[in-house]
From Swiss-Prot:
The keyword Transcription regulation applies. It comes from Escherichia coli (strain K12). Activity is regulated by DgcM and PdeR. The keyword DNA-binding applies. This is HTH-type transcriptional regulator MlrA.
Length: 243
């Protein structure tokens, strides 16, 4: 029977080891074996279970309810992510930044960056993106807390083995998405730095020797896609980002 370390499982299942530990310790979702030295070992059944957990979470189920679902108990799973958006909005409206940071940090331990970005942060940020001054202020607070949290995550990820990459925005307006995309990439094995401002004209030769991960917004233009392909054919280490 094959056994896998937590690092190997993280790569196989595309999930952060911190999240795997949280699923085990806080929620009792996993029961890995242990070596004599105390290191976790997972078998193929564990990997199947992890993938099933991810499927439930991606469908909007809160982590705290997944264990009952795995036990075939009846659970109300409707509107899970909408509920989490409302919780986050309540923290924003309270003005208590410490509680807001703590809540986001806990979610970051419980869920993969891709899942949180897709189902929580992007939808709520869209709700706040309007001309109403109060909502604009809440969005500014949220973005500041997110960037601060993600910067800490990226700094921690850079201490691990991986390939260095620079996240670059190409002709975009929403620079917070650069940080969210960089966070996702960091959980896929990249050691990420983020170029803080979007570039209207991207010139890969200015970043010679660097791997560039390029965010063009949610819908790349055909011209951008053609140019990215051309740069790759010229030997530039450049790849598009996107959920």
């Amino acid at each position: 029977m094959a056994l896998y370390t937590i690092g190997e499982v993280a790569l196989l299942c595309d999930i952060n080891p911190v999240t795997l530990r949280a699923w085990q310790r806080r929620y009792g979702l996993l029961k890995p074996q242990r070596t004599d030295g105390g290191h976790r070992l997972f078998n193929d059944a564990d990997i199947d279970r992890i993938r099933e957990i991810k499927r439930w979470i991606d469908n909007g189920v809160q982590v705290s309810k997944v264990k009952m679902l795995l036990s075939n108990e009846n659970v109300d799973v409707q509107n899970g992510w909408r509920d989490q958006q409302e919780t986050l909005l309540t923290y924003l409206q309270s003005g208590n930044l410490h509680s807001l940071r703590t809540w986001i940090k806990e979610r970051g331990q419980d869920y993969p960056a891709q899942t949180l970005t897709t189902h929580l942060f992007i939808p709520l940020r869209r709700r706040l993106q309007c001309q109403q001054p109060t909502l604009q202020a809440l969005l500014a607070i949220l973005d500041g807390v997110l960037i601060n949290y993600i910067a800490i995550c990226l700094a921690s990820a850079r201490k691990k083995q991986g390939k260095d990459a620079l996240v670059v925005g190409w002709n975009i307006q929403d620079t917070t998405r650069l940080w969210l995309e960089g966070w996702i990439a960091s959980q896929q094995g990249w050691r990420i730095d983020v170029l803080a401002h979007s570039l209207n004209q991207l010139r890969p030769e200015l970043f010679e020797g660097r791997t560039l991960l390029v965010w063009c917004g949610e819908n790349r233009t055909s011209a951008q896609q053609q140019q990215l392909t051309s740069w790759q054919e010229q030997g530039h280490d450049i790849f598009p980002l996107g959920i």
